[in-house]
Amino acid sequence: MKSAELKSFLEIPYDELEDMNLKAAQRAEKAGAKELEQEYTAWLKKEKHIKAVTLCFSDIEGRLHMLDYDKKFLLESLGNLTFDGSSIRGFTPQHESDLRLGVDWASIRYFPADVLGAGKVIFFASVLNADRSPYRSDFRGVLKSYTENLKKKQGVTAYAACEIEGFLVDGQNAEQRYGEDGFKLISSGGYYHSLPMDTLRQFIDKSAEAQRALGFKNEKDHPEVAPSQFEMNFSYADVVRAADHVQLYKLICRQTARSMGHTATFLPKPFVGINGSGMHTNFSLSKNGKNIFYEAKRKDGLSDVA
């Protein structure tokens, strides 16, 4: 008997994942933090096919850090999920290294097993001081606190949609090996120009499929202006969820590229003589379900707020 047959960790088809993640996002909009915590801790206790819970946070330079907690340990230690902040660039000095993670239960994503591994579920986390006060360099936490106050005091919800460009380059770990070989393009096509089954198109298709499974509301995807450059567009979300989308988008692209023997890089200017990569960000504000940037009778439909 093969060892793989002894394991029965959670692996969910992409179409089911999409439904689960969309429902989780809708649930997060309606339920409070305590209610979500009760629901998901109960689910984790019951779901025998989950082996680990992945918690994510970002450092001050935007790197995504991921810690896998054994499910049972996490459930027993929710008030004391410690990590060494001195090992994170720009965080605490060594003598103040004791930081905590607080699970943001509204951020749950049921992840494709072929991207993150079977038997895992992922949450973003807030970084906390030892006394569980918000850590000053947790910019996601700062954004979350600001938007919650904006909603509470003014009834305003902030939305964003990001258009993230990147390059697909030849070989795994190409960024780490740049000093040896530089970057090598995998496609000579340009804007909207890629044959249906060439390497860049296959990469875009696979990445977009994983994003859809994660609950991204995909709109369009295409090769960008420069050779080997890509962009995949998806719909807006509240700004905290939109920020999470940026990190997940990059994670998915990197994992997909790696599985194909290549590297997805989001460096702003990796090549001389051709376009670099950027990230247009579209913002809007909503109050009582209405876009307060819009006013039909004003010039160009723009309100005073805009």
Task: Locate the predicted segments by residue.
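Detector for methionine-enriched segments
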Residues: 1, 20, 66, 197, ...
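ATP/Mg2+-dependent ligation/transfer catalytic cores
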Residues: 1-220, 242-245
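Structured core elements
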Residues: 54-56, 66-68, 124, 167, ...
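Short, charged/polar low-complexity linear motifs in solvent-exposed/disordered segments
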Residues: 82-85, 236-237, 259, 283
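Secondary-structure junction/capping motif
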Residues: 134-142, 172, 238, 258, ...
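Histidine-centered divalent-metal-coordination microenvironment in nucleic-acid enzymes
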Residues: 163-177, 223-237, 267-289
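Accessory "access/gating" subregions that flank catalytic or transport cores
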Residues: 195-200, 204-218, 232-239, 250-266
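Glycine-rich anion/phosphate-binding loop at the beta-strand->alpha-helix junction
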Residues: 241, 246, 250-306
